[in-house]
From Swiss-Prot:
High-level lineage: Bacteria, Pseudomonadati, Pseudomonadota, Gammaproteobacteria, Enterobacterales
One Pfam family cited in the UniProt record for this chain: EcpB_C
UniProt keyword terms in alphabetical order: Chaperone, Fimbrium biogenesis, Signal
Native source species: Klebsiella pneumoniae subsp. pneumoniae (strain ATCC 700721 / MGH 78578)
Name of the protein described by the UniProt record: Probable fimbrial chaperone EcpB
SUPFAM superfamilies reported for this sequence: PapD-like
Length: 222
């Protein structure tokens, strides 16, 4: 499921993905016990970059998710929303959730508009920095319900999320297929109401292990 989250939507104009701004993980999670989140971004190029950031709420982070209205104008705040990032420099962007304290999980797309800068005019009277290349990057912010209810069911190598918050699930142990080698590992995000079957790890083997993360709490399942 992780690969189906709305991943980096990189719409490039004159830059390659390797040159674009490094914004860290594609999916970020704000757990129920926290109302703040920090993301470190890095400019690994040799030129300064102008970064503008905004958020939009999504009906779902999966393919087909639509942009929907916020419950309130200041539902999620961020700072700074615009910055100049020198070459080889990094900075921290902070997000603050101010929305309803209910039992709903919420999803947001963080849109990073990244422009490279160059000195286009140089003389004693006039010097200006002009954007020469740009990239639009989309990542996902998941805000867990303030009234969280973690629940799941496991049977025959399949996990079902019966709670109201996304789980990070994993399995590791002997591979189900000899062609995959001896040891395999699987990691997925499992949204509320969804099920996932492990297809590479032999979870029926006594050495096969299944576990999950409920927020920051690690929970062995099998």
């Amino acid at each position: 499921m992780k690969k189906h989250l709305l991943a980096l939507g990189l719409l490039l104009a004159g830059v390659s993905p390797a040159q674009a701004l490094d914004v860290g993980d594609i999916s970020s999670f704000m757990n129920s016990g926290s109302s703040t989140l920090s993301k470190t971004i890095k400019n690994s190029t040799d030129s300064g970059r102008l970064i503008n950031i905004h958020l939009e709420r999504l009906s779902s982070p999966l393919d087909g998710g639509q942009v929907i209205p916020m419950d309130k104008p200041d539902e999620v705040l961020l700072t700074p929303a615009s910055l100049l990032l020198p070459a080889q420099a990094s900075d921290v962007i902070r997000f603050f959730y101010k929305g309803p304290a209910d039992d709903k999980e919420r999803y947001y797309r963080i849109v990073w508009f990244d422009q490279a800068l160059s000195d286009a005019q140089r003389d004693n009277a006039n010097r200006s920095a002009v954007a020469t290349a740009s990239a639009r990057i989309g990542t996902i912010l998941v805000v867990a319900p303030r009234q969280v209810n973690y629940r799941f069911q496991y049977a025959n190598g399949s996990l079902t999320n019966t709670g109201n918050a996304t789980l990070r699930i994993l399995a590791y142990g002997p591979c189900l297929k000899a062609a995959d080698g001896k040891e395999c590992k699987e990691n997925y995000y499992l949204m509320p109401g969804k099920s996932r079957r492990f297809t590479r790890v032999d979870t029926a083997d006594k050495k096969g292990r299944v576990a999950l993360w409920q927020g920051e709490q690690f929970v062995p399942v099998k």
